Amino acid sequence: IFGPMSIPIGAVPFSLTPLLVYLAAYILGMRNGTVAYLVYLLIGFVGVPVMSGYSGGPAKILGPTGGYLMAFILMALMTGFVVERFYRNIPLQAVVMFVALIICYAAGTAWFVGQTKMALSKALAVCVYPFVPLDCIKLGLAIIIGRPVRERLRGFLQARSAASLA
């Protein structure tokens, strides 16, 4: 788990969590990728220090940056869906993953503003603008890394999925 490794650059730390959410959904698919992230969130909620800055607990998830953590659930669902349904259409995957990122920014920033009472313009300057270029790189890396890994694991994942349905 790379979530704890973060760079505190302000109210919202830089972390690899968006990349890992994208990768989990890209490689494992919509259901399993989302479940993997939910397990991570639950582990963090009970206090295991898996969140940014080696932190955890309800205060982390319900605090100012918790909206982003919760919005990653939708990011995993959307990424997994588009990869499963439109695997050959990489441009569409990138667009849907970017839309998921925008939704994550919107939900997370709304939560942040509600928690901190910071003006929206300032919250955007602190919580969104510095992250857009890096998060777009993470999105691209998820596609570049996720495709070959998913293809190599395809038989294994299909066998596991069939076994879980039996």
Give the location of each predicted region.
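Interfacial aromatic-anchored transmembrane helix boundaries in multi-pass membrane proteins
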Residues: 1-13, 41-75
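Hydrophobic transmembrane alpha-helices
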Residues: 1-34
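Helix-loop junctions at the membrane-solvent interface of multi-pass transporters
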Residues: 2, 53-54, 82-86, 114-115
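Hydrophobic alpha-helical transmembrane segments
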Residues: 19-23, 34-39, 65-70, 91-99, ...
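Structural signal for the C-terminal ends of transmembrane alpha-helices
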Residues: 27-31, 78-86, 149-153
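Alpha-helical transmembrane segments and their lipid-water interface positions
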Residues: 33-40, 48-51, 75, 79, ...
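Short helix-perturbing small/polar motifs within transmembrane alpha-helices
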Residues: 58-106
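Membrane-embedded alpha-helical hairpins and interfacial helices in multi-pass inner-membrane proteins
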Residues: 87-161
